Regions:
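The structured alpha-helical core of multi-pass membrane proteins
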Residues: 1-194
Length: 194
């Protein structure tokens, strides 16, 4: 980031964490109405950035051909499986954004994933791949390399908001699982406040 901002990263991050738990302690029900639009905007930005950069190297579209994946796993062995693990990690990371939406049925969640989240993520990953193929120096931070300079700060704010929402979901999930473990007698009795 430069410009003296590097020294502010840790205090700003600490402030975001304090705010996250302060809001969590009072309940997130008032802010929950913002979670859907922010998450939707985040996925739209992801997809849009990908669309902008797929044309950096059209050969990235070969990723849809299964032979290249099989060939990669066969030729690179253990490294290929480690990278495959990263793919699964990327998918579960996106899942955290809507992990606590248990009040929705299976059908809406499946439809949202199939018709919105998955295409946006796929477009973004294809865009990142094409960008790295065209600009090898982007390999260290492919996502931020795709963000136009003029959009950097708005995307950073949106990314932070999406991370806070994902954190809320993970925290809520952890509290819920702990409460269920206590109720089942699998965890010592503790007072759980949400």
């Amino acid at each position: 980031l430069g410009g003296g901002f590097d020294r502010a990263i840790v205090p700003i991050s600490a402030g975001v964490l304090v705010a996250l738990f302060a809001v969590k302690a009072r309940g997130t029900h008032r802010m929950a109405a913002l979670f859907g639009p922010i998450t939707g905007a985040w996925f739209l930005v992801l997809g849009g950035l990908g669309v902008l950069h797929i044309s950096d190297d059209w050969s990235i579209l070969r990723a849809f051909l299964p032979w290249y994946g099989v060939q990669f796993l066969l030729e690179d062995g253990l490294v290929g499986f480690v990278i495959l693990g990263s793919v699964f990690l990327a998918v579960t990371g996106a899942e955290a954004l809507y992990a606590d939406m248990g009040h929705f049925g299976k059908a809406p969640i499946r439809a949202a994933w199939l018709w919105f989240v998955l295409p946006c993520l796929a477009l973004n990953y294809l865009g990142q791949g094409a960008n790295v193929l065209a600009h090898p120096d982007a390999r260290l931070n492919p996502f931020w390399h795709m963000v136009p300079e003029i959009a950097y700060w708005p995307v950073l704010v949106l990314a932070t908001a999406a991370a806070v929402i994902a954190s809320q979901a993970v925290i809520t999930g952890a509290f819920s699982m702990t409460q269920q473990a206590v109720q089942l007698g699998l965890f010592p009795r503790i007072d759980i406040r949400r």
